[in-house]
Amino acid sequence: MGAQLRVYRRRIRSTKSMAKITRAMELIAATRITKAQRAAEAAAPYAREITRAVSAVAARVSDHPLLTEAENPTRAAVLVITSDKGLAGAYTANAIKEAERLTALLNEQGKEVLTYMVGRKGIGFYKFRERPLADSWEGFTERPSYMHAMEISSALMEKFIQETAEGGVDEIHIVSTEFISMINQRARASRILPLEVEEVDSKVLEAEQGPLPLYEFEPGAEEVLDQLLPKYVTNRIYFALLESAASQHASRRAAMKAATDNAEELVKTLTRQANQARQAEITNEISEIVGGADALAAASAGSE
């Protein structure tokens, strides 16, 4: 019984130690969420304005190669953003699941898929299953910079401009995680090229976004679009990296909070079991003492 009590006490100590670690990781993740949110909020105005500018130019240019749908698209690039580290709940699993759903859909449409991966966890997942990756990046998912987005954008744009027969792609999709709230993040897939220009009533658009800007294009709309579209693609990737970083920290915070709560509950259970074992040990010792006293009393009475 004494050995069992020691086991309980040892488990209580180790569980309390683990709870301290997960609590510290929860607090660190909470701090990083705030920083990641601020970075995303700071990038939002530029993302919004460049999107409006590209939309305005695209409305005047109909035959630009980055806007034109291929008659028979045969190959698509899919950029998947995962994490470099674990202990983030289902963050990476959800992103990979969404990427696999998109890949299956594109395959059904007769398109070959080239997968581009961001994050060690996603890279490890694909390498373990011997799945091919066209390219990969790692080491910056928690704190992405604009330079990282430019590097990724450059690789994808090079493939998009290249002829399909020479190994190029007809479409570029991105799978990232949308930060909705501290407790709600959602993996999503979106196409960034060819750019989809939707016909929207100007009155409806003005009611939603305010007065539309009036642009004059020099030397011409097509030349301006040549400069704007690469920046637009880079910005879309950068914003996706920032949102995914915030989502990753939020998911890690939730996972660490759940781990801390579970550890505290386990400590309560183990403490209760240890107390029961201690009480049983005390009861057993008392029974042995009483039994010994009775035996001595009986022996003394017999000798008399």
From Swiss-Prot:
Localization (cell): Cell membrane
Main location class: membrane
Keywords: ATP synthesis, Cell membrane, CF(1), Hydrogen ion transport, Ion transport, Membrane, Transport
Record PROSITE patterns: ATPASE_GAMMA
MF-aspect GO terms: ATP binding; proton-transporting ATP synthase activity, rotational mechanism
Signal peptide coordinates: none
Gene3D superfamilies named in the record: 3.40.1380.10, ATP synthase, gamma subunit, helix hairpin domain (1.10.287.80)
Reported function: Produces ATP from ADP in the presence of a proton gradient across the membrane. The gamma chain is believed to be important in regulating ATPase activity and the flow of protons through the CF(0) complex.
Protein name as catalogued: ATP synthase gamma chain
Source organism (scientific name): Thermobifida fusca (strain YX)
GN (gene name): atpG
